[in-house]
Amino acid sequence: MKAAEGVTVVYVADTRKAMEDMVPFFFDYPSRKMRMIALTGTNGKTTTTHVVSHILEQAGYKTGVIGTIHALIGDKELPTHNTTPDVIDLERLLWQMAEEKVTHVCMEVSSHSLVMGRVEGVEFDNAVFTNLTEDHLDYHKTMDNYAKAKAILFEKVSSAGQTKGNKAAWVNVDDPYAHVMMDAVDQKVADLHTYSMSDKTADLYAFDSRFTGKSSAFKVIYEGKTYQFETRLAGRFNIYNTLGAIGAALSEGISMETIAAAMKTFHSVPGRFELIDEGQSFTVVVDYAHTPDGLEKILTTAQEITKGRILVVFGCGGDRDKMKRPIMGRIAARYADVAIVTSDNPRTEDPETIVKEVAAGVEEVKAEKPSLQVEVVVDRRSAIQKAISLAKGDDIVLIAGKGHEDYQILKDKTIHFDDREEARKALKESCAARF
C-alpha cells in the first residue's frame, strides 16, 4: 500500500487491536474520569444495572447507564444497538458522559463484547456477576467457553497498572460457574465479595423472602447485621438482582440504610416482569425472558404468586442458538397450564419451522402431562389475543421473549411490534366483547 504524500501510515499486525488502543486515547480515556460499574451474566444484567443507578442517584450522584434497552445520562435517553456498543460508539458515549459530569457509569457487559475487545480500553472499578445459563452457544459453542468469556471482565477489573484504586468484584456464589469468575480475580488488586440466597457464609446473604404479584420483601445479613428490604420487584430472581446491586453500591461507599431506602422507590424496568393492567381480573406480565433459565425463572415466580392457572406465550428467535428451542418448550410445558407457542423474531428463518422445533419440546412433556393445554399460533399478535381470551379470575398470563422490544424482525423487513401494546389492545377488546 502506497500512502499519499504527507500522510503518515502506521502498519499494524491487528487493526482491531490497534483501534482498541487508539480510540480511548482519542477520547482522552473517559472511563478513567468516572467510576465504572460493570454488570455481566446471562440474565439479570438490565435490572441490576438500573437498580445500581437508582441507588447511586438517591445517594446524590449523577449516573450514566449503558445497556440492552438504552443509554441514559441522568434522565436523558440515548438509543443503543447492542447490549455493549462497539468501541468507537462506546468511547464516544463515555466521553459525552464525562463531559456532562457523570460520576458513575452502570454498564451491561456482554460476553461478545469481552471476547471481541469492545471494552478493551475501558477501566472498570466494580464488577458484578449475576448468573450463567445456556445462551449464545451458537457463538461460544460450550458453556465452559461462555464462562471463560465472562471471566475476562473479572480479570480486567483486577488487572495491574490501572489508574484508579478501590476495585471490587461481586459474585453470585449460588451459580455453578461462580468459581470461574472468582478464580479470575486478582485479590491483591480487587476486593472479592459474594452474595447468596443459600450460603450463610456469603458476604451478602438474603433470607426470609416473601412475595406478592407486585413486590418482594426479604432480610439481608451483612457484616453481622440484619437489614429489612422491601422492593416493587417481584420474584426470587429479582432478589438475586437486588443483592448484586446492593453489593455494587456498598463498594461505592453507599450505606445499607441509604440502599434500603432507595429500593422502596425503585420501579420496574421496562419489559422486565412488567405488569399490564387494564382493570382485568387476572394478571398479565410482559418479560424479556428469552433463555431457558430466564423462562424458568418467570414461570416459577408465577407459581409463587398465582392461585389460578399459568398461561404462557413464548417462542424462540431465528438465526440464534437452535439447541435451546425444544429445551424452552419443555420448560414452558413443565410449569404452565396453557402453553401457546408462537413466533419471536424469526429473522431469516421460516417462522413455522422455528415454532415446530419449540413445540416438539412441549409435546414431550404433554405426553406425561395430559392436562396441559397446547396452542400453536404462529402469528404473535393472535397468540397474545388467544391467551387473553382464555384467561380468567386468578390466572396469570406471561408474554415472554421480547420484553421492551418495540419491533419484530422478519425475513425481509423489521416491523413495529410491542408485546405491551398488543396486550393492552387485547385486554381492551376482550373487555368490550364481554360487556
Can you say where each PLM-predicted feature lies in the sequence?
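N-terminal leader/targeting and accessory segments in enzymes
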Residues: M1-D21, F207, E230, A234, ...
